[in-house]
């Protein structure tokens, strides 16, 4: 091994070979050097692992081709459009909500041009970026005032820091949630400078538990919608109206972290456990916090809505600037919110809601069309099967939607190998493996995805 490593050529020597001359004509010296350095490192690892008993020919066409492939790989963007065939509508790893065309157009306009982000066009003086969406949020939720920050965790942190720093926050033991990435609500409360007071039991908490824990140091009663898990069986949780009455009597603030946050009723589509934001505020909750890129169907952001006096105090807090929403997300959010107003039907215009409400007959027709196009392209083992799709994004874990899927077997590739190859295709196709078949749930596809899927299979299965 040591003898082989001693014979590895120097980088400068390789760059001077005739084999590299053609690459240096097409690419910069820095690009070629970086790719060569990576190739040499791979050879070194192979020797050290005992996988190589001789060095490759560094001037061969195969080695040069590998270096060129490395250069091209470095030139490709890391963040690419992908096709979500998982059956999970709001897939966190795939970017959550797909934006509506109107939202994308708004992002393009805001990014390509100067805008009145913080300019009052009527007076010519400095304005507030929040003014572009605050009235819309209030109209759609019934809130007195609203504020938008960069994500829901920031919304919770800001809300608690501005109202409860140095004081107590009371929360039920059954609602001390953990979201993705191991971020836990107790940690957020601690970071806000407040002290957490847990009440009740994991499965049962009553309004009297909150009442007994309130003292002069208590600032906030905090509810959290357990959107990513459910506690069932011998359980009890107080009604929001009970806690709202208690908060009024004791001069405390009732806040609720709704997580996903939905502006419309999903029960007609069999999804019954997601509270509508306007209903939560009507019940007497003072402040709600929810995400913009989940069931709302907009960009990543955290929306805070509720009592005007509390929202004003949040806007004045120093943390507000540190977590403020950027102009592109703001543009996308405004455009998305407008799709909830007449004459628009959000279930037709907002992609997330369209995916949830889409009739299964349409999904089955799309599945048959995809299966037919794959068959025409030469993929012979293709089949349509019933499936179940999920909302995702930490929402409605116990509920699913009737769907249809297309399954594929490629003879020379195992399901795992096929899935890996499709992830490496352009566009990458992300599906599932069930019963030794690669499966694509069609509820999370749109008609425009089908040509990309066929092209990906051409790249992978027919080569």
UniProtKB/Swiss-Prot annotation:
Main EC class the enzyme belongs to: transferase
InterPro entries, sorted: PyrdxlP-dep_Trfase, PyrdxlP-dep_Trfase_major, SelA-like, SelA_trans, SelA_trans_N_dom
Subcellular location as annotated: Cytoplasm
One of the record's GO cellular component terms: cytoplasm
Enzyme nomenclature, EC number: 2.9.1.1
A biological-process GO annotation: conversion of seryl-tRNAsec to selenocys-tRNAsec
Pfam families: Se-cys_synth_N (PF12390), SelA (PF03841)
Pathway terms, separated by semicolons: Aminoacyl-tRNA biosynthesis; selenocysteinyl-tRNA(Sec) biosynthesis; selenocysteinyl-tRNA(Sec) from L-seryl-tRNA(Sec) (bacterial route): step 1/1
Modified residues (N6-(pyridoxal phosphate)lysine): 294
Keyword terms, alphabetized: Cytoplasm, Protein biosynthesis, Pyridoxal phosphate, Selenium, Transferase
A GO MF label: L-seryl-tRNA(Sec) selenium transferase activity
Catalytic activity: L-seryl-tRNA(Sec) + selenophosphate + H(+) = L-selenocysteinyl-tRNA(Sec) + phosphate
Obligatory cofactor(s): pyridoxal 5'-phosphate
Physiological role: Converts seryl-tRNA(Sec) to selenocysteinyl-tRNA(Sec) required for selenoprotein biosynthesis.
UniProt similarity note: Belongs to the SelA family.
Protein's UniProt name: L-seryl-tRNA(Sec) selenium transferase
Organism encoding this protein: Hyphomonas neptunium (strain ATCC 15444)
Gene that specifies this protein: selA
């Amino acid at each position: 091994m040591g003898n082989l490593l001693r014979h590895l050529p120097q980088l400068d020597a390789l760059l001077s070979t005739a084999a590299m001359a053609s690459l240096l004509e097409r690419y910069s010296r820095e690009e070629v050097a970086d790719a060569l350095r990576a190739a040499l490192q791979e050879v070194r690892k192979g020797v050290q692992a005992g996988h190589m008993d001789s060095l490759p020919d560094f001037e061969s066409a195969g080695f040069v081709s590998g270096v060129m492939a490395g250069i091209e790989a470095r030139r490709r963007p890391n963040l690419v459009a992908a096709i979500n065939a998982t059956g999970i509508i709001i897939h966190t790893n795939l970017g959550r909500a797909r934006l509506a065309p109107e939202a994308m157009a708004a992002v393009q306009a805001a990014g390509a041009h100067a805008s009145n982000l913080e300019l009052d066009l009527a007076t010519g003086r400095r304005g507030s970026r929040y003014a572009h969406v605050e009235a819309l949020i209030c109209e759609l939720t019934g809130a007195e005032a609203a504020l938008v920050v960069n994500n829901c965790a920031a919304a919770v942190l800001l809300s608690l820091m501005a109202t409860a720093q140095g004081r107590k926050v009371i929360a039920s033991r059954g609602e001390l949630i953990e979201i993705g990435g191991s971020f836990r609500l107790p940690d957020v409360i601690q970071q806000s400078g407040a002290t957490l007071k847990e009440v009740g039991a994991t499965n049962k908490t009553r309004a009297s538990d909150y009442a007994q824990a309130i003292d002069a140091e208590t600032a906030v009663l905090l509810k959290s919608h357990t959107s990513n898990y459910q506690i069932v069986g011998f359980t009890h949780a107080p009604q929001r109206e009970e806690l709202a009455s208690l908060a009024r009597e004791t001069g405390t603030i009732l806040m609720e972290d709704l997580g996903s946050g939905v502006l419309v009723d999903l029960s007609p589509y069999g999804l019954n456990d997601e509270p509508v934001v306007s209903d939560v505020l009507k019940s007497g909750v003072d402040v709600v916090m929810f995400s913009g890129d989940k069931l709302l169907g907009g960009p990543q952001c955290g929306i805070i809505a509720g009592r005007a006096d509390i929202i004003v105090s949040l806007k004045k807090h120093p943390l507000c600037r540190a977590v403020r929403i950027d102009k592109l997300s703001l543009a996308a959010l405004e455009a998305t919110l407008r799709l909830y107003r007449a004459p628009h039907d959000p279930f037709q215009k907002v992609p997330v809601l369209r995916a949830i409400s889409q009739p299964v007959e349409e999904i089955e027709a799309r599945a048959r069309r995809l299966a037919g196009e794959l068959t025409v392209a030469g993929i012979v083992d293709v089949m349509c099967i019933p499936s179940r799709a999920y909302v995702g994004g930490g929402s409605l874990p116990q509920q699913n939607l009737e769907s249809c899927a297309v399954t594929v077997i490629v003879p020379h590739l195992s399901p795992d190998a096929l899935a890996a190859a499709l992830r490496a295709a352009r566009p990458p196709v992300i599906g599932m493996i069930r019963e030794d078949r690669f499966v694509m749930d069609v509820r999370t596809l749109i008609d425009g995805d089908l040509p990309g899927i066929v092209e990906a299979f051409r790249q992978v299965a027919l080569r």
